[in-house]
Regions:
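Active-/binding-site microenvironments in catalytic and ligand-binding cores
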Residues: 1-228
């Protein structure tokens, strides 16, 4: 069995979506402080983290798209353990729209069918090219509404991409989120290492969210498993 990590590392002030709270990570109690508190028996250090529910590699809950949408603590866990494929879209220029014909060509090139009730991961190469420079937050290509509709028509539960947003920055990205609400589909953002999945066929995707009450999304530890 081979497990490939598709998740960004979390650390203090790691890049976050523009306008959202920063990721803050620090020491709450050192080993030395805890050792003294224990009566010089054992010192157990503790860290703390503060972050938005859309920080790092994460999945959007339907609640993110609309106030009546399902919160992340109610999101079906069976949707987080599914078959998946990865499409090579690295030829798409920065800031460009991915259209249905791009997806159709990528599926044909991959030579593998899209799994029903599974996931489709879109490797644009954006993370590999730009992280952690400022361009990571602004220059990504992404799906447009028509491509989002095409993905939903494939009877998948979600799709994922190696950038901070599913669509290109601006109006198109907002319309893609609106389409996700209307189409009852969601997506994962800020994946990485998708290049390792290219031309390898179907895999098992695992990406379990935290059980945050009324959460609009959640960080996930996303992995692809071959030979499970």
């Amino acid at each position: 069995m081979e497990i490939i990590d598709l998740s960004r590392e979390l650390y203090h002030r790691t890049p976050t979506y523009p306008g959202q709270p920063p990721i803050i990570h620090g020491v709450w109690k050192t080993h030395e402080e805890a050792f003294v508190e224990s009566g010089n028996i054992q010192g157990n250090s503790v860290m703390f983290i503060s972050m938005p529910d859309h920080g790092g590699t994460h999945i959007d809950a339907p609640r993110h798209f609309g106030k009546n949408g399902m919160p992340i603590n109610e999101y079906p866990l069976e949707y987080c353990y599914v078959k998946g494929i990865c499409l090579d879209l690295r030829h798409i220029p920065p800031k460009a729209e991915i259209v249905p014909s791009d997806l159709e060509a990528a599926v044909k090139k991959a030579g593998v069918a899209i799994p029903k009730k599974g996931t489709v991961l879109l490797c644009t190469g954006h993370h590999e090219r730009t992280f952690p420079t400022p361009a990571y937050a602004t220059d990504n290509p992404g799906v447009n509404v028509e491509a989002t509709e095409w993905l939903a028509q494939q009877d998948i539960v979600h799709f994922g991409i190696d950038s901070m947003r599913p669509g290109p920055m601006g109006v198109v990205n907002s319309l893609v989120h609106k389409a996700c609400l209307e189409l009852d589909i969601t997506h994962m953002e800020s994946l990485c290492n998708l290049e390792a999945l290219i031309s390898r066929g179907e895999f098992r995707f695992i990406g379990l969210p935290l059980k945050w009450r009324d959460g609009t999304g959640s960080p996930i530890r996303a992995v692809a498993v071959f030979g499970d």
